[in-house]
A protein has these predicted regions:
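Buried hydrophobic-core signal for structured, non-transmembrane domains
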Residues: 142-148, 189, 206-210, 232
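Short loop/turn segments at connectors of secondary-structure elements within structured domains
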Residues: 90, 152-156, 171, 202-204, ...
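Intrinsically disordered, low-complexity Pro/Gly/Ser/Thr-rich segments with frequent PxxP/GP/PP motifs
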Residues: 157-201
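Substrate-binding clefts and catalytic carboxylate motifs of secreted carbohydrate-active enzymes
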Residues: 1-154
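Short beta-strand elements
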Residues: 215-232
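Short hydrophobic alpha-helix segments
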Residues: 106-107, 173-175, 220
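Short, aromatic- and glycine-rich surface loops/edge beta-strands on solvent-exposed regions
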Residues: 197-215
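A generic structural motif
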Residues: 147-149, 161-165, 209-213
């Protein structure tokens, strides 16, 4: 299988939006913003708001709406890409839609019309890297996959740290791992209780790092609930 087209929309940067919109029209429901939204007959902005409210809470202003649309897009596509890469060999490819734009507006791109990178483009550099640590959490358990597109196997270390929102280390472990070539390898399955060890899931997060020759070549932050519930 090769997943060749999947995506989530977001808005371009505020600098790009201001190139086609007057200050008085900076609203998801304004005629100009709807005209620059080609999904669902101009109603796609309401879909963006639905997911933003569900996962991040109510945006405090238009700038926050634009910013959160990019965060939502980046985290959603990253989740899909990690699932697809970790499912190798059942899934042998992952291409999100789309790279760039032919005009400025809300779209599925990771680079906007003027060449400005959205948040997704920065995330894609990490989740499409040749070596990737991909923790996949569902139903209170996390499976940890090591994904390699390299043609030679290697030995590495997998570091796991659990920290609180103030940056304090709660506990950590360091394991030797073998990373086969051209493969996805499941190296651990961890229950939330084992990761948290009594810590508050809304005040804690896990950091997974794949370390090769003393350097972290892949890093992934795992949260235990949606962002709107976290106590930052």
């Amino acid at each position: 299988r090769f997943q060749s087209e999947y995506g989530l929309q977001s808005f371009p940067s505020m600098a790009t939006i201001r190139s086609f919109t007057a200050p008085a029209a900076l609203s998801p429901a304004s005629p100009v913003m709807r005209a620059h939204q080609k999904f669902d007959g101009g109603h796609g902005n309401q879909s963006l708001l639905f997911y933003i409210r569900k996962y991040y809470g109510e945006p405090k202003d238009f700038d926050s709406f634009v910013y959160l649309s990019q965060v939502m897009q980046a985290e959603g596509i990253e989740l899909a890409a990690d699932h697809l890469r970790s499912a190798r060999p059942q899934s042998m490819g992952s291409l999100y839609w789309q790279l760039n734009d032919v005009w400025p507006g809300a779209s599925w791109s990771s680079i906007d019309y003027f060449g400005r990178w959205k948040t997704l483009q920065f995330h894609a550099r990490r989740f499409y890297a040749p070596l990737r640590v991909a923790p996949i959490r569902r139903d209170g358990r996390t499976e940890v996959f090591l994904v390699s597109d390299r043609t030679a196997p290697l030995d590495a270390r997998l570091r796991l740290r659990v920290m609180d929102m103030d940056g304090r280390l709660l506990h950590e472990r360091l394991d030797q791992v073998h990373v086969p070539a051209l493969a996805s390898t499941r190296v651990a399955e961890l229950a939330d209780a084992a990761l948290l060890q009594g810590a508050d899931p809304h005040r804690s997060f896990a950091v997974f790092e794949l370390i090769v020759q003393g350097r972290a070549v892949s890093r992934h932050l795992l949260y235990f609930d949606r962002a709107s519930t976290l106590q930052l």
